[in-house]
Amino acid sequence: MAHLLLLHGPNLNLLGTREPEIYGRITLPQIDAALAERATAAGHGLSSLQSNAEHVLIERIHATPEDGTAFILINPGAFTHTSVALRDALLAVALPFVEIHLSNPYTREPFRHHSYLADKALGVVCGFGVDSYRIALEGVIARLGSDV
């Protein structure tokens, strides 16, 4: 059994109400519950954290070596395009991670076209709405089954 950590960045607490034409109507607690259920069915544990504060996400990443986290799934939200600190934290703990986005940043404003995480991620899943999370989790489960 592996422990998986799911991190959500700024404004994702507003899912279901914020720009539903882009992000959909499903709420973050609904996403977390569905992913935790799927991880459990695959024999793994999953915990999640959402924060609008960069330092909270970084501190949680820093705690992963001591808590047995095997894999990180992260939707960094707007921190994707701005946070060298988040990138450095992920590199410091040296755990595999997948970057997730509900929308496809490359079809949006030009400032969203750059990710500070993508070149270090095992993979990036974007543009499939809520299914982006499910696809990412299935990829992680498959990797864990093959002894990353």
Curated annotation (Swiss-Prot):
GO terms for biological process: amino acid biosynthetic process; aromatic amino acid family biosynthetic process; chorismate biosynthetic process; quinate catabolic process. This is 3-dehydroquinate dehydratase. NCBIfam families: aroQ (TIGR01088), PRK05395.1-1 (NF003804), PRK05395.1-2 (NF003805), PRK05395.1-3 (NF003806), PRK05395.1-4 (NF003807). InterPro entries: DHquinase_II, DHquinase_II_CS, DHquinase_II_sf. Belongs to the type-II 3-dehydroquinase family. Homododecamer. Catalyzes a trans-dehydration via an enolate intermediate. The gene is aroQ. The record marks 18 as: Transition state stabilizer. The keyword Protein biosynthesis does not apply. The active site is at 23 (proton acceptor), 101 (proton donor). Keywords: Amino-acid biosynthesis, Aromatic amino acid biosynthesis, Lyase.
